[in-house]
Regions:
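Short, aromatic- and glycine-rich surface loops/edge beta-strands on solvent-exposed regions
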Residues: 95, 101-116, 222-228
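Short acidic/polar inter-strand loop motif in beta-rich domains
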Residues: 55, 112-119, 230-236
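Beta-strand-rich domain onsets/edges
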Residues: 24-45, 120-179, 185-190, 236-257
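Aromatic sugar-binding surface patches on proteins
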Residues: 84-95, 208-211
């Protein structure tokens, strides 16, 4: 029976996570900047969107289940600061936040489950982004405690083009070896064209310790997403369906001038 259960689970996972020709979904959590300096405005904006970053395609997003910031281990609920915005016909969310203390600010979002008809499963991506305040580099590698998350090993801000980025993928606080991590460039203005489909989404795998590595080739916003199958299912029209959970992290890369 254990063998049958394992086989069934693997089949469901393969169908839900690796449907041929399906575009990669990413939960967006993109601030107006990754570093707030003494001369900058202390108020930043954050876009909370559900999208295909490279292709510039968006999907409707309901108001998140959770949205907050963690500074030096202390969490603040920011859910009620979100306001709905439209990107074309699609619903997205935006918030303003005023930085009051030095140190790293870890913003995080847990969206409500998104039903993906094409993949016959729900999608829940837990996204994070780190914004540095006033040059005090404290807290960027702290864990928020999300169901699944990427814990950076490389400081996730102040990155130059060509820097190597590393992170650990965790589910329920435990590293996940041998899992795929999808990587995409946020092609905001659509100027970058991929000569072939495999170049839209880059893919790397975690090692035996759950660590992945990627050398970032271009300035701009990049996102990493490690996908897993949740142990629990959700009902859709009375039938239990699998849930794809994703650990998502956004980083900004700068050209050296």
């Amino acid at each position: 029976m254990k063998g049958i259960f394992l086989f069934t689970t693997l089949v469901i996972m393969a169908f839900c996570l690796f449907v041929p020709n399906s575009r990669a979904h990413f939960q967006g959590l993109i601030p107006s900047d990754d570093m707030v300096t003494k001369s900058d405005s202390k108020t930043i904006s954050l876009d909370v969107i559900f999208l295909h970053p490279f292709e510039g395609l968006y999907m409707n997003m309901a108001k998140p289940a959770k949205f907050g910031v963690m500074v030096r281990g202390k969490k603040t609920d920011l859910l009620e600061t979100l306001r709905e915005k439209k990107i074309g016909e699609f619903s997205a969310w935006q918030a303003n936040y005023t930085v009051k203390t030095p140190g790293d600010h870890i913003f995080y979002v847990e969206p409500k489950p998104y039903w993906e008809q094409a993949e016959d499963c729900f999608i829940v991506h837990y996204a994070k982004v780190v914004v540095n305040s006033l040059g005090v580099e404290v807290g960027w590698d702290e864990e928020v405690g999300l169901k699944t998350e990427i814990v950076p090993l490389t400081r996730p801000y102040g990155l130059w083009t060509g820097n190597v980025f590393q992170g650990i993928v965790k589910v329920n606080g435990k590293p996940i070896p041998g899992t795929e991590v999808e990587v995409e460039y946020y092609n905001r203005d659509g100027k970058v064209e991929a000569p072939a489909d495999p170049m839209v989404t880059q893919v790397v795998k975690t090692d035996a310790n759950g660590v992945f590595t990627y050398a970032v080739p271009k300035a701009g916003w990049w996102t990493f997403a490690a996908l897993s199958l949740d142990e629990e299912k959700m009902k859709h029209k009375g039938e239990k369906k699998p849930v794809e959970i994703g650990a998502v992290l956004w980083v900004k890369v700068h050209d050296m001038k």
